[in-house]
């Protein structure tokens, strides 16, 4: 499987993808050069583990611009972990990804039966409707967990789409 990850962060999403023996390659697109520098200098907690895996690659760029452009290759899985939620983006330019048009462009980057997964801290009926207009199969999963930092239960959301 070939996996595209939007956003490096602390590297946990990439590491989880690399745990599968079925994964041949994980390409991470990170917008912020300092985050890539932290990885190179070993300041990201998973830096050594990620950099030791020959299947891992990180490039600087805007994953949303990449997904809006004609595909250079197709991915079996696209994991987006960039914005706070479809309704609360980190930058105004990101908003177009969450629309029917943006999702149609992103879908072109998926291999046949490929899966798009988007993390969010909040549910979004508007985004779910856009996904359902573009993809054959859509599933929205709440993820309940105890946030040890703030000492309370939280719910995040995963949006899955295929076909």
Roles of regions detected by a PLM:
Residues 121-123:
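Active-site beta-loop-alpha junctions enriched in small/polar residues
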Residues 161-163:
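Active-site beta-strand termini and strand-to-loop segments that position acidic
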Residues 1-112, 118-119, 129, 139, ...:
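The AdoMet/dcAdoMet-binding core of the Class I SAM-like
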């Amino acid at each position: 499987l070939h996996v595209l990850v939007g956003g490096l962060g602390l590297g946990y999403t990439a590491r989880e993808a690399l745990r599968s023996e079925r994964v041949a390659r994980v390409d991470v697109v990170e917008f912020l050069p300092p985050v890539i520098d932290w990885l190179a200098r070993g300041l990201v907690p998973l830096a050594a583990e990620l950099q030791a895996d020959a299947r891992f690659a990180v490039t600087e760029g805007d994953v949303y611009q990449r997904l809006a452009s004609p595909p250079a290759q197709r991915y079996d899985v696209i994991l987006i972990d960039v914005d706070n939620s479809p309704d609360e983006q980190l930058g105004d330019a990101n908003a177009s990804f969450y629309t029917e048009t943006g999702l149609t462009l992103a879908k072109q980057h998926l291999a046949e039966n490929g899966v798009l997964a988007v993390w969010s801290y909040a549910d979004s009926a508007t985004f779910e409707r856009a996904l359902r207009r573009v993809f054959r199969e859509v599933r929205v999963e709440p993820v309940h967990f105890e946030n040890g930092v703030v000492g309370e239960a939280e719910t995040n959301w995963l949006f899955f789409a295929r076909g």
